[in-house]
A protein has these predicted regions:
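Alpha-helix capping and helix-coil boundary motifs
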Residues: 86, 137-139, 190
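Short, charged/polar low-complexity linear motifs in solvent-exposed/disordered segments
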Residues: 27, 42-44, 171-172, 183-185
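Active-site C-terminal subdomain of aminotransferase-like
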Residues: 2-109, 117-121
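Secondary-structure boundary elements
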Residues: 21-26, 130, 189-191
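Short, intrinsically disordered/low-complexity patches at protein termini
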Residues: 48-50, 178, 189-190
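A common structural junction motif
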Residues: 32-38, 146-153, 184-191
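Conserved C-terminal alpha-helix-loop-beta "cap" of PLP-dependent enzymes
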Residues: 95, 102-184
Length: 192
């Protein structure tokens, strides 16, 4: 199972299920709601092996969790765009966004910015911002960023080490100035 949102960039309420036919079939059968006769039911053979069934499935447990046609079209479009962009171009775009942020923050005293995952397109590149000043408290900065007028969500994984992570997956070029200014303001405010 793959999230339709996040890296692929589709609707958040979507996903892609693929893999073994028997497992995909089991999931598909739990999303059906049939008022149809057995002889009328013609499921796609690639998805459902009708020969393994005793009758038409009734009201699967996943029925109330169905995905709308808008989400299906959205995730298929997002997947097509994801494939068309390609791993190398996507990796280069992510690195470019991170470089803009790193360069814009490089003049702040007592922080150390490290670029991670830049070597291969199979990695998601990240920035690691280490706060080296005496009043540093990454957790407070992260909370301030999330509760700002325009919330900015950063990776809190290493906050106990006074480090903030920047993941580029959801970054959009036109919002980079907002992200940069928010991080700059949060650090500057804490150092006062």
């Amino acid at each position: 199972a793959f999230s339709g949102g996040k890296v692929i960039g589709g609707p958040q309420a979507s996903g892609i299920l693929c893999g073994r036919q028997d497992l995909v079939m089991a999931a598909a059968l739990q999303h059906l709601d049939f008022d149809i006769f057995w002889d009328m039911w013609q499921p796609p053979e690639m998805l459902i092996d009708k020969g393994r069934m005793r009758g038409v499935p009734q009201h699967g447990i996943g029925r109330p969790c169905k995905v709308g046609k808008e989400e299906i079209v959205g995730v298929l479009t997002a997947l097509q765009l994801f494939i068309e962009e390609g791993d190398d171009a996507r990796h280069a775009r992510w690195k470019s966004h991170l470089d803009i942020i790193a360069n814009a923050l490089s003049d702040i005293k007592d922080i150390e910015i490290t670029r991670l995952g830049y070597e291969s397109a199979s990695n998601v590149p990240n920035l690691d911002i280490k706060l080296n000043y005496s009043s540093a408290n990454a957790a407070k900065i992260i909370n301030a960023l999330q509760s700002g007028t325009i919330p900015v969500h950063v990776d809190p994984m290493y906050r106990d080490q006074n480090r903030i992570g920047i993941n580029p997956i959801c970054l959009i070029q036109e919002y980079l100035p907002i992200v940069i200014q928010s991080i700059r303001d949060a650090i500057t405010t804490q150092r006062r």
